UniProtKB/Swiss-Prot annotation:
Xref: CDD domains: PEPCK_ATP
Pfam family for this entry, one: PEPCK_ATP
Binding, ATP: G246, L247, S248, G249, T250, G251, K252, T253
Record's keyword annotation contains Metal-binding: no
GO molecular function: ATP binding; phosphoenolpyruvate carboxykinase (ATP) activity
PANTHER family assigned to the protein according to its UniProt record, in alphabetical order: PHOSPHOENOLPYRUVATE CARBOXYKINASE (ATP) (PTHR30031:SF0), PHOSPHOENOLPYRUVATE CARBOXYKINASE ATP (PTHR30031)
GO cellular component terms, semicolon-separated: cell surface; cytosol
Known pathway: Carbohydrate biosynthesis; gluconeogenesis
Catalysed reactions, semicolon-separated: oxaloacetate + ATP = phosphoenolpyruvate + ADP + CO2
Its EC number(s): 4.1.1.49
Lineage, opening ranks: Eukaryota, Fungi, Dikarya, Ascomycota, Saccharomycotina
Broad EC category: lyase
Protein name per its UniProtKB record: Phosphoenolpyruvate carboxykinase (ATP)
Stretches that traverse the bilayer: none
Length: 544
């Protein structure tokens, strides 16, 4: 591997040619090509078309979602002692890495056109990293142009050598018989080489989430900056910052879109000593069942320059049918964040979060619509990352299933969850942040037994009470077993909804049974982390 020296923007092509052994006569290299040029090239692929709204419709082939079982971290001396090894971060040897990197290079050498995207991850100039993506599909180049932070002309001219490089040869399979491999797909990250190789999957989200994994490593280890899988907004009037954590279907995107607040970002953030900044320059929004009525900002962001992934459209009008999931439930759109009118540009806040919101969609109906958390409870529930996986979100899921994802982003974590949880608790204590657990799921009973989903208007009323400071001053009562502090009243929310013990349609005995069942799942899940948890954190969980 050549050493990383300063290289001017004009010699990027020479560097890529040298690294891959490319012939000038054979391969055209497009660097930071504009959207119109990428559209032109993408449309040469058979299925790719332009939607009636002007977005590029592209298809990722066999893989329409991430392949977490095929993610590998190279086991090497610089990162070995920090990485959280296990099912999330499976190791591969440096030899396997070398084989797969060369396999990717072999494939890229055969392409008539390669695309290079040089851009940034992280809006704070103090912490941002320079990222280079090398790929063979124009759709992938446009996707990463949208998702990374686009450099100015001057920044591009002075870009120099990247801090991290993605080699995307996803159209070409890995050799499943190579050591440490289990399939024809591999997504490998090498923290020593600061590179990533993709083989055997054309799903564009692997690039985005690979860089997220890198930031989950670099920021805490090298800068003592906390990386978070969250959305973030800031009050227009008071400048107060709120972080929203939540798994798919909990309302993270919907609730962070607020007419009284500016959007800093919808998915990936860092919390430093200076404040909060977005990692990305774009949004990767779910499109299933999308409508202008439900999500007007997302709907209107789907226009020229955006990438629609794996959607079904009318062959004559090219109008997209957002309700059609025949290819996948995981239809997506990638667009620059400045396509959202309420976005704050640059996407950072020189202020510390005043409120931390942990969102859950509890289909058991046991958890209250809102409860106030102690710092120890924040650590416990942050590490647990509980929600209910709803029917239809994954193949074979016909009824809601309880699921846990540590730090609300387990597939992307590089370090042990306790490291992130400890940093979060320390920052909350230092900056006197309030923390809340909000259940956007069922009340009155479980989903199966006829409970009702908590109305969005009530959840928004709860958020309004959090943001105006009135909820922090409310009178609270304790909910047994989970020991959650539940407000007795919230303006705009029926009081009978606030305490599920009083609201349970099947009576108190059935409620206690449901509570004990859910608490048991929490306790069982937390056994994975209890060896690194303090007694205070363990005591903050449900007590059976």
């Amino acid at each position: 591997m050549p050493s990383k020296s300063s290289v001017s923007g004009n010699s990027v092509e020479e560097r890529i040619r040298s690294e891959l052994g490319l012939s000038k006569e054979v391969t055209l290299i497009r660097r930071n090509a504009p959207a119109a040029v990428l559209y032109q090239d993408a449309l040469k692929e058979k299925k790719t078309v332009i939607s009636s709204a002007g977005a590029l419709i592209a298809y990722s082939g066999e893989k329409t979602g991430r392949s977490p079982k095929d993610k590998r971290i190279v086991e090497e001396e610089t990162s070995r002692d920090n990485v959280w090894w296990g099912p999330v971060n499976k190791p591969c040897s440096e030899r396997t890495w070398a084989i797969n990197r060369e396999r990717a290079a072999d494939y890229l050498r055969t392409r008539e056109t390669l695309y290079v995207v040089d851009a940034f991850a992280g809006w704070d100039p103090k912490y941002r990293i320079k990222v280079r993506v090398v790929c063979a599909r124009a759709y992938h180049a446009l996707f990463m142009t949208n998702m990374l932070i686009r450099p100015t002309e001057e920044e591009l001219a002075n870009f120099g050598e990247p801090d991290f490089t993605v080699w995307n040869a996803g159209q070409f399979p890995a050799n499943a018989r190579t050591q440490d491999m289990t399939s024809k797909t591999t997504i490998e990250i090498n923290f020593k080489a600061m590179e990533m190789v993709i083989l055997g999957t054309e799903y564009a989200g692997e690039m985005k989430k690979g860089i997220f994994t890198v930031m989950f490593y670099l920021m805490p280890v090298h800068h003592n900056v906390l990386t978070l899988h969250s959305s973030c907004n800031q009050g227009i009037k008071n400048g107060d910052v709120t972080l929203f954590f939540g798994l798919s279907g909990t309302g993270k995107t919907t609730l962070s879109a607020d007419p009284h607040r500016l959007l800093i970002g919808d998915d990936e953030h860092c919390w430093s000593d200076e404040g909060v900044f977005n990692i990305e320059g774009g949004c990767y929004a779910k499109c299933i069942n999308l409508s202008r009525e439900k999500e007007p900002e997302i709907f209107d962001a789907i226009r020229f320059g955006s990438v629609l992934e794996n959607v079904i459209y009318d062959s004559e009008s090219h109008e997209v049918d957002y309700d059609d999931s025949s290819i996948t439930e995981n239809t997506r759109c990638a667009y620059p964040i400045d396509f959202i009118p309420s976005a704050k540009i640059p996407c950072l806040a020189p202020a510390h979060p005043k409120n931390i919101i942990l969102l859950t969609c509890d289909a058991s109906g046991v958890l209250p619509p809102v409860s106030k958390l102690t710092p120890e409870q924040v650590m416990y529930h942050f590490i647990s990352g509980y929600t209910s996986k709803m029917a239809g979100t994954e193949q074979g899921v016909t009824e809601p299933e309880p699921t846990f994802s540590s730090c609300f982003g387990q597939p992307f974590l590089s370090l042990h969850p306790m490291r992130y949880a400890t940093m979060l608790a320390e920052k909350m204590h230092e900056h006197s942040a309030n923390a809340w657990l909000i259940n956007t799921g069922w009340t009155g009973s479980s989903y199966v037994s006829g409970g009702k989903r908590c109305a969005l208007k009530y959840t928004r009323a709860i958020l309004d009470a959090i943001h105006d400071g009135s909820l922090a001053k409310a009178e609270f009562e304790s909910l047994p077993i989970f020991n959650l502090q539940v407000p007795k009243a919230v303006e705009g929310v029926p009081s009978e909804l606030l305490n599920p013990a009083r609201n349970w349609s099947e009576g108190e005995a059935k409620y206690q049974s449901a509570v004990s069942k859910l608490a048991g799942l929490f306790v069982e899940n937390f056994k994975t982390y209890q060896d690194k948890a303090t007694s205070d954190v363990l005591a903050a969980g449900p007590q059976l």
